[in-house]
Amino acid sequence: MRCLPVFIILPLLIPSAPSVDAQPMTEDDVPLASFHEQTLQELWNKRPCCPLIPGCCR
């Protein structure tokens, strides 16, 4: 009875084949890493300036 959850969860963890809806990237698509980096940069620029900590204000 202990193995029953394993047999239920294991098939969910196995990656499936790409679906038919998968489409190649277009010119307008932005890679997720680039979007994440841009978001971090915007958050960094919005931080309040703290003159007592070197390198805080850029």
From Swiss-Prot:
Disulfide-bonded cysteines: none
Post-translational changes noted in the entry: Contains 2 disulfide bonds that can be either 'C1-C3, C2-C4' or 'C1-C4, C2-C3', since these disulfide connectivities have been observed for conotoxins with cysteine framework V (for examples, see AC P0DQQ7 and AC P81755).
Propeptide positions: the record gives 23-47
Keyword Coiled coil on entry: no
* InterPro entries, sorted: T-conotoxin
Tissues of expression: Expressed by the venom duct.
State where the protein is found.
Answer: Secreted
Family the entry assigns:
Belongs to the conotoxin T superfamily.
- Name recorded for this polypeptide: Conotoxin Leo-T2
Tell me what organism the protein belongs to.
Conus leopardus
